[in-house]
Amino acid sequence: MMTPIWRKMRPICVSAVVLATLAGCAKDTPYAAPSFGFSNAYSGHKAGAPVLLENTAWWKGFKDPTLDRLVVRALQDNLSLAAAKERITEAEANLQAIPGGVSLDPSLGVQRSKGIGGTPQTRSTATVGLSWLLDPYGARRAQGRAANARIEVADAEADAAQLLMLSNLSTAYIDLRYSQQVLRIRHQEINSRRQTLELTQTLFDKSSATRLDLLRAEARLSEAEAAVPTARSAVLRQQYQIAGLLGVAPGLLDISLDDGPMPRPAMSANVGIPADILRNRPDIRIAERIYYANGAEIDVAPAQLYPQLSLSGAITLASIASGAPGGVRGAEYVFGPSLTLPSLPDGPRRGALAAQESRARQAHTAWQSTVLSAVGQVESAITEYSASAAAAQAAQKTVRLYQEAASLTRDLVLRDSATLADLLDAQESITNAELTLAQNQRQLSLGFINLNVSLGSGHASGRASGQEVAPISN
């Protein structure tokens, strides 16, 4: 036999069961992942096997311990990476900020009163409020899916920040070693032209050279010395940039950046196949997750077009105590559904829905554009890397030939079979050829960096990639 309280509570319980059943019937709009028509291989490159490059430490291909140490330090202390990680924390907090379907609102209160000449009384109350908003259109779940996607966007942005940092740091390091190589070439040029000046002075003293020859030799030496300050300034500038990328003030970096050789890639980049960039490039994952989030937010808008049903109530326990023996205790409760109708006209809300659908289509177009741009960047990087390798090889041969020509010219000058002007020109040709070789070696190294960055290689190296995100409860 039902008690009077249960008899009164039964309609409420039945309503709760019905509401839960209706809420469970809500269906999400199915998500169709965007697709792109990739070729089987990059142009001018043999078809390979799919490869995951997220943890590839491609910079170790330079076999440069100093660069390896700089990368390890930058992964720990780079300020841009720290800011990107905080954006992940913010996105996770935004997910937790989405209100759930059920909320409890407890409260406690104590009130003491005393009338004129009366007995003091203390009234104590404890109330628990309950609110349950029915979500038959899955708006909250859609908000949760969108928030989860925003977390994944923030995570991919952290990967992109790491990739950019690796690119900037490696490029700055290559430029540093290039500037140091240029400085070495300038000092070698000064030594060579000083020797030529001494030879010219000796020949002038023997009346075998003219005053014009002597002036030309002095001018060439002065010209070489004038190029040194600019080269030295370039070295310092790159050292300061590297320190900044490591989050250290200039002059406080404890990793030596003194004179060192120009690093050259000791291995080829693992290119894989074009379809690999969908998972290897953070910017493509960002665009895809933004598209997903915009699609999920479409499911939020329809809820504003229809009535909203909610169940709310409260249970209050009260106690009144006075100086007299005994007291009063009691309980009261109130429960009931409420229906909120949308305001009319509904044109603004339907317009908001149409605008959200348009944003989703825009996001899809942006994804396609990002993929197309990424494929083009990889194709260009492959071509530039191959061209730089060929140019560097040819430049090495050029330097060797000019060195042989300069040595022969010096011998001919001593035998009066060539002029001092010929020797000065030969030495200048060596300097220009060595500068060209250094530039080509720099381009080869930068091409290796650019190719790996274009492939998305190493974006999660040194840390766990991706995050498991718990779905929002309904």
Can you say where each PLM-predicted feature lies in the sequence?
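Small/polar-residue-enriched beta-strand and adjacent coil segments characteristic
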Residues: 27, 57, 63-66, 70, ...
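Heptad-repeat amphipathic alpha-helical coiled-coil interaction surface used
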Residues: 88-90, 95-97, 112, 144-146, ...
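Short histidine
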Residues: 419-431, 462-468
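Amphipathic alpha-helical coiled-coil segments and their boundaries
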Residues: 77, 84, 133, 140, ...
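Periplasmic alpha-helical coiled-coil/stalk elements that build and connect Gram-negative outer-membrane
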Residues: 3, 140, 156-273, 384, ...
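A short glycine-centered flexible hinge/capping loop motif at secondary-structure junctions
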Residues: 204-208, 413-417, 454-458
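Terminal intrinsically disordered/low-complexity segments used for targeting and assembly
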Residues: 2-76, 148, 232-279, 321, ...
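Mid-chain, structured segments of secreted extracytoplasmic proteins
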Residues: 72-95
